[in-house]
């Protein structure tokens, strides 16, 4: 990927990076481990973003 990115693309990538987190521990504890994963988790090599 280019080192010089347009700002809009950079913001989209940053948002995707922030969304790509695990479920917080307090959620797992509060739901008695009923919620362990979230379906929108993305792996950088398997699933690419629309750019």
Swiss-Prot record:
GO terms classed as biological process: translation
One GO term of the cellular component aspect?
Answer: cytosolic large ribosomal subunit
- On the tree of life, the source organism's domain of life is Archaea
**Matches recorded under Pfam families:** Ribosomal_L39
Gene3D superfamilies the record matches: Ribosomal protein L39e (1.10.1620.10)
Keyword Ribosomal protein in record: yes
The record's InterPro entries line, in alphabetical order, gives: Ribosomal_eL39, Ribosomal_eL39_CS, Ribosomal_eL39_dom_sf
| Assigned keywords, A-Z | Ribonucleoprotein, Ribosomal protein
Q: Which residues form a coiled coil?
A: none
Tagged with keyword Ribosomal protein: yes
**GO MF term set:** structural constituent of ribosome
User: Into which family does the record put it?
Assistant: Belongs to the eukaryotic ribosomal protein eL39 family.
Name this protein carries in UniProt: Large ribosomal subunit protein eL39
What organism does this protein naturally occur in?
Pyrococcus horikoshii (strain ATCC 700860 / DSM 12428 / JCM 9974 / NBRC 100139 / OT-3)
